[in-house]
Amino acid sequence: MKEHTHAFGLTVGTLFTLVMFVAVGADRVGDVYPLDTCPISGKKLGSMGDPVVKVIDGREVRFCCSGCVGKFEQNTEASFKSVDAKIVETQKPSYPLDVCINSGEKLGKDAVDTVIGNRLYRTCCADCAKEIRANPGKFQEKLDKAVIEKERATYALKKCPVSGESLEGGVKPTEVVVAGHLFRLCCADCKAEIEKNPAKYLDLLKSPQTH
């Protein structure tokens, strides 16, 4: 097929390549943004309308308004350092493993806390953290399985938090992990709804007696 040159001297093939590059570059790696506040203003997400969702360096970040996006991107290293500290603070108490997810060694006082793809990983050393960075999908799957195994026994919601359908009476729920916690759903499609507003559904886990 012949390539046709358009304005600015770009061929159809070149344009297609650029579009594909942008699409791939905008893909989220890892989990949704797990915090309920804007990383710049500190305001509760949703307090100024629908949050602005951006993928920056492969990670999803949510902001209270578009004005905060530029401030975050002025120094992404410092901005992510602040976000990571909050993720460690919120996810560490419920972290499901007492061994390094890579080596299997017992985690001690010198364990390394690393946030990759908006998830906390605890390793015995910095070298193991590098292994996770090299293959995040593999280790997220392992971490998700550990979360499910730990939280399944104490999971208190009797209904799908999205549809409201009962999960009792022999129903086999779909089990997913979002923001480091187990959700039991009536179907896989409901996961997308939780990812739209993870803070809302995490609150349901904190007060299961009302749901």
Give residue ranges: language-model regions.
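N-terminal secretory signal peptides that target proteins for export/translocation
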Residues: M1-F8
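Bacterial N-terminal signal peptides
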Residues: G9-V22
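Intrinsically disordered, low-complexity terminal tails/loops enriched in metal-binding residues
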Residues: H4, F21-H211
